[in-house]
């Protein structure tokens, strides 16, 4: 029983697959059948009939016969073959020979594609032929009119073309022969060949018109304009040479020889070969070269004027530097008697003197070159610019060194003034301590005050020791200033602390009789106070009073600050 059921299932599956494959094949057969009918219904005969108004000879006749033969072959051979193959495909499908049916369908598609492609080629060739004939009828009138215009212009200005006239007339005659050949090909039905000939004559006439427009100017350039420019350049060169300008580095004679050869080549290309493009290119190159040579001559003139203008100024600046050097050298000798110059300062003076030597050497070198006959001004500009840079550098070195010499005296006066201020500050601080009612001064503060006094004394000795070493003086003065200012700040802080302690203890005395612990703490604070331990005294007194009367210490300190601000 199970075997029978399995067999039935297999048969049903095979039937379903076969049905599905047959359905797809019949669907493809229907598609190819529709394609075949579409090809058969193409209006090829109607399209071919479009050329019947043309002359049925030559190319046109050949095209017509070939197109008709190809269409007949499609209708009588290809499509019947397709019909036969479609029938075969149906038979193979009905017999479940699906693989064979697919092969036949592929072959049918290839046949239909080939037929379709052949038809498209025919339609394109028909369109090209008809278009060529239509376009030829339009263009021939324009080309003939252009021919008449070119001939008229050539005859009207024949005197401008010289020996080129014969060659241009020959080209024009060839264009006319081409027009006549076009008409012959058209008469013979060769419309596409005639199209190519017509386009060729159109291009030929365009080129001739271009020649007519450009040749006169190019001939004038070759025979008059450019030779005149070269002669003018040569005359200018000779005139500058006679005025004493050194121009050998420009090598104009050699350049003129080269340019004249190029001019002859351009003329040959123009006259013998009618090669306007290359001749124009050479003439443009010659024009650029002439402009470059003029730029070089102009640069030489400008360089000469600039050197003649700048050399006296640079000479004067150098002489001023030498005078400054003599003056500063004497001033340096005097300064050395009172001040000790550092190695860096002395190096500045040496660098300045070395730069002066370089300037003198370079200036001598430039003057020697200016006296020679073969040195161009433009070749000296770099050295002139270098000389100016050297002079500017030397002036900067001199100004820096001289400014430092002048600053030494200012530094000394400033140091003495600062030292006097430090002495006054320290004296006032000591006097303030003596006038205050404090029990005494802590030992460490006394030591700092004595150290400050000693440092002031050392700076004073440095200022009396000649020659002065100002860097050392300034360093010691800075250290002394820092120490004195620290002593002053600590003294003010200590006196303020003493006043705070007295205010707090005085306030705490209100509670001593009632608070035994507070009384003992205040006694300890007083003991430390008279032992010069003001920080410890403040801490104990403030803690005790704050405990007895919270917020009181802060109010006392605020009151003190307010009173100090109004003093």
UniProtKB/Swiss-Prot annotation:
Keywords: Cell cycle, Cell division, Cell membrane, Coiled coil, Membrane, Septation, Transmembrane, Transmembrane helix. It is found in: Cell membrane. Pfam families: EzrA. InterPro entries: EzrA. One of its GO terms (cellular component) is plasma membrane. The chain crosses the membrane at residues 3-21. It is a single-pass membrane protein. The keyword DNA repair does not apply. Residues 108-185, 243-375, 402-529 form a coiled coil. Residues 1-2 are extracellular. Residues 22-567 are cytoplasmic. Negative regulator of FtsZ ring formation; modulates the frequency and position of FtsZ ring formation. Inhibits FtsZ ring formation at polar sites. Interacts either with FtsZ or with one of its binding partners to promote depolymerization. NCBIfam families: PRK04778.1-7. HAMAP family: EzrA (MF_00728). This is Septation ring formation regulator EzrA. It comes from Bacillus pumilus (strain SAFR-032). The gene is ezrA.
């Amino acid at each position: 029983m199970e075997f029978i059921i399995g067999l039935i299932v297999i048969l049903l599956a095979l039937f379903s697959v076969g049905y599905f494959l047959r359905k797809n094949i019949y669907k493809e057969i229907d598609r190819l059948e529709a394609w075949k009918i579409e090809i058969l219904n193409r209006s090829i005969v109607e399209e071919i009939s479009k050329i019947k108004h043309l002359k049925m000879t030559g190319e046109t006749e050949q095209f017509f016969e070939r197109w008709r033969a190809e269409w007949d072959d499609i209708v009588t051979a290809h499509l019947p073959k397709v019909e036969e193959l479609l029938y075969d495909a149906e038979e193979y499908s009905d017999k479940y020979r699906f693989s064979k049916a697919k092969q036949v369908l592929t072959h049918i598609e290839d046949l239909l594609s080939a037929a379709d492609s052949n038809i498209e080629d025919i339609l394109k060739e028909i369109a090209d032929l008809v278009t060529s004939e239509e376009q030829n009828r339009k263009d021939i009138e324009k080309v003939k009119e252009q021919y008449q215009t070119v001939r008229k212009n050539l005859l009207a200005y024949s005197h401008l073309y010289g020996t080129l006239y014969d060659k241009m007339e020959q080209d024009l005659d060839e264009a006319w022969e081409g027009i006549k050949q076009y008409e012959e090909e058209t008469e013979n039905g060769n419309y596409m060949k005639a199209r190519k000939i017509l386009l060729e004559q159109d291009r030929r006439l365009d080129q001739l018109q271009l020649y007519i427009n450009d040749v006169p100017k190019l001939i004038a350039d070759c025979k008059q304009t450019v030779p005149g420019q070269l002669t003018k350049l040569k005359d200018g060169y000779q005139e500058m040479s006679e005025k004493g300008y050194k121009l050998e580095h420009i090598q104009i004679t050699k350049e003129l020889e080269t340019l004249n050869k190029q001019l002859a080549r351009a003329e040959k290309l123009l006259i013998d070969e009618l090669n306007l493009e290359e001749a124009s290119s050479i003439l443009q190159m010659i024009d650029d070269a002439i402009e470059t040579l003029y730029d070089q001559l102009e640069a030489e003139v400008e360089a000469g004027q600039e050197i003649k203008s700048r050399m006296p100024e640079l000479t004067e600046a150098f002489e001023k530097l030498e005078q400054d050097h003599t003056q500063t050298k004497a001033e340096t000798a005097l300064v050395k008697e009172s001040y000790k110059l550092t190695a860096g300062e002395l190096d500045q003076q040496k660098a300045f003197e070395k730069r002066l030597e370089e300037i003198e050497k370079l200036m001598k070198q430039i003057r020697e070159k200016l006296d020679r006959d073969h040195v161009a001004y433009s070749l000296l500009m770099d050295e002139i610019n270098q000389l100016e840079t050297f002079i500017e550098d030397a002036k900067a070195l001199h100004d820096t060194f001289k400014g430092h010499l002048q600053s030494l005296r200012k530094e000394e006066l400033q140091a003495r003034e600062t030292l006097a201020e430090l002495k006054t500050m320290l004296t006032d601080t000591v006097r303030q301590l003596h006038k205050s009612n404090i029990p005494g001064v802590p030992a460490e503060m006394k030591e700092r005050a004595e150290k400050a006094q000693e440092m002031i004394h050392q700076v004073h000795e440095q200022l009396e020791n000649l020659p002065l070493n100002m860097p050392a003086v300034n360093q010691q003065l800075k250290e002394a200033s820092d120490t004195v200012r620290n002593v002053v700040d600590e003294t003010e802080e200590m006196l303020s602390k003493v006043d705070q302690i007295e205010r707090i203890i005085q306030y705490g005395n209100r509670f001593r009789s009632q608070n035994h612990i507070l009384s003992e703490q205040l006694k300890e604070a007083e003991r430390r106070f008279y032992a010069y331990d003001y920080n410890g005294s403040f801490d104990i007194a403030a803690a005790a009073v704050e405990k007895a009367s919270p917020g009181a210490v802060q109010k006392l300190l605020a009151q003190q600050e307010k009173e100090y601000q109004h003093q």
